């Protein structure tokens, strides 16, 4: 059964290049942060000049561009807010994504015609909250990641005349929809001001502690007691409760000790798995969710391209009434990730949300190794700008907006027209044989991995 309704595919844009790849692979819209006022102050290419370029390019393609203004501002940020926002408003973005009621009030007073989308940072978790923000004049609410599909359905039923947006892919925060103080506490970098250092991903050590005469937790001086967190299996509610107290340290700051406790649920460590909800696109489409959002403004252009391609197909299939293509789940395994979870869309045990073993992203399926430049040599071979090492004889996938092909590398030339057996890494260029009728614009190259992973891609 086909449906006229098709959700918007909303991709992250940490740079103009990421935006262009997202659009090429099927995104309907992108979001990017305003300087000083978004939660991605670090790794944000978008100054006012680039925002103008991005918004104009998006509109020329019939796409949309949303500007994120979602910090929790202190008084000092209010002094220049309207003055700083005026040039952005003049660029005519399609909406502002905002969380702070005070900033929203100022925008409504000064720029009444701009659409405002409520940021996930505002933690909208019930239909009454959504209805309130509709009455305040907002046109879309980005629902909290902590909601189940049934709760989303009830919100849709109770407030049918406002747009809803849901995160379907990307990193999850161990705090409630990102409202975290961990980085501020440990590293003096306030996540709510856009300077999160991802302290929840760091590697920590645990050692047994003891309590002193006044009840403070202090080190138990016995180096033999020191253990690695990753070697301790979590109890996850099944182990016996312990009255032991612990101290933990981050590997880069061994002299700074923090306290930890264990209860019937285990010791709480903070590394969430990544969200992957492509299998729920059909259901979310049927519910009338207007926008399906991919997290990742600090991710690579390859990530933007691959996620856009996968979720584009899932949305198109759902709108056409086609059954879910389970191979899309496997395709997303090719991206480096911290383990996948469905998040809170369905209820799971604790270990299905958390990764207790490592904090880095990894894939054992593929590694992104090259970007096609669009050029061909006199023999018609396509040029690749190498990003990671690959070898003659490797099996690779070539990804393009028109479709993907797999092949084995049987010949490579360098720019001197010399035969080479290795593309050595970033900064090198090689030529490969690919079909002449393939459009090389936005084409990417991935190496298929066998019995290895992206942490040690050439270990076998």
From Swiss-Prot:
Keyword Magnesium: no
Gene Ontology terms, MF aspect: peptidase activity
Superkingdom of the source species: Bacteria
GO CC, any one term: cytosol
Entry keyword annotation includes Cell division: no
Record-linked Pfam families: Peptidase_U32 (PF01136), Peptidase_U32_C (PF16325)
Gene Ontology BP annotations: proteolysis; tRNA processing
Keywords: Hydrolase, Protease, tRNA processing
EC number(s) per entry: 3.4.-.-
Protein family (similarity comment): Belongs to the peptidase U32 family.
Function: Involved in prephenate-dependent formation of 5-hydroxyuridine (ho5U) modification at position 34 in tRNAs, the first step in 5-carboxymethoxyuridine (cmo5U) biosynthesis.
Protein name: tRNA hydroxylation protein P
Organism taxonomic ancestry: Bacteria, Pseudomonadati, Pseudomonadota, Gammaproteobacteria, Pasteurellales
């Amino acid at each position: 059964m086909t449906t006229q309704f098709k959700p918007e595919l909303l991709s992250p844009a940490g740079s103009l290049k990421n935006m262009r790849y997202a659009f090429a692979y099927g995104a309907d819209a992108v979001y990017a942060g305003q300087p000083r006022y978004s939660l991605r102050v670090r790794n944000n290419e978008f100054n006012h000049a680039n925002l103008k370029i991005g918004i104009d390019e998006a509109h020329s393609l019939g796409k949309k561009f949303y500007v994120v203004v979602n910090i929790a501002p202190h008084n000092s940020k209010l002094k220049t807010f309207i003055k700083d926002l005026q040039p952005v408003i003049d660029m005519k973005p399609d909406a502002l994504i905002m969380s702070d009621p005070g900033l929203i009030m100022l925008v409504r007073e000064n720029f009444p015609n701009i659409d405002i989308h409520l940021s996930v940072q505002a933690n909208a978790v019930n239909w009454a909250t959504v209805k309130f923000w509709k009455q305040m004049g907002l046109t879309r609410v980005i629902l909290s990641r902590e909601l189940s599909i049934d709760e989303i359905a009830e919100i849709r039923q109770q407030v049918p005349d406002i747009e809803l947006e849901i995160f379907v892919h990307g990193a999850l925060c161990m705090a409630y929809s990102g409202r975290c103080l961990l980085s501020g506490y440990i590293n003096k970098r306030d996540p709510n001001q856009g300077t999160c250092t991802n302290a929840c991903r760091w590697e920590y050590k645990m050692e047994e502690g003891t309590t002193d005469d006044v009840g403070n937790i202090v080190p138990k001086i016995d180096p033999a007691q020191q253990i690695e967190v990753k070697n301790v299996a979590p109890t996850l509610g099944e182990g016996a409760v312990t009255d032991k107290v612990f101290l933990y340290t981050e590997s880069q700051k061994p002299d700074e000790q923090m306290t930890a406790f264990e209860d019937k649920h285990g010791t709480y460590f903070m590394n969430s798995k990544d969200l992957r909800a492509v299998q729920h696109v059909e259901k979310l489409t049927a519910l009338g969710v207007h926008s399906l959002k991919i997290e990742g403004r600090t991710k690579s252009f390859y990530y933007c391209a691959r996620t856009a391609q996968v979720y584009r197909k899932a949305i198109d299939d759902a709108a056409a009434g086609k059954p879910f293509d389970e191979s899309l789940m496997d395709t997303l395994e090719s991206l480096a990730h911290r383990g996948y979870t469905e998040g809170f869309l369905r209820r799971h045990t604790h270990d299905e949300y958390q990764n207790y073993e490592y904090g880095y992203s990894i894939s054992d399926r593929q590694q992104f190794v090259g970007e096609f430049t669009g050029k061909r040599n006199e023999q018609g071979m396509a040029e690749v700008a190498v990003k990671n090492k690959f070898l003659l004889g490797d099996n690779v996938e070539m990804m393009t907006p028109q479709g993907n092909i797999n092949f084995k590398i049987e010949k490579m030339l360098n720019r001197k027209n010399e035969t080479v057996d290795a593309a050595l890494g970033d900064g090198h260029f090689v030529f490969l044989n690919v079909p002449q009728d393939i459009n090389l614009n936005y084409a990417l190259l991935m190496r298929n991995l066998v019995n290895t992973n992206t942490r040690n891609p050439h270990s076998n």
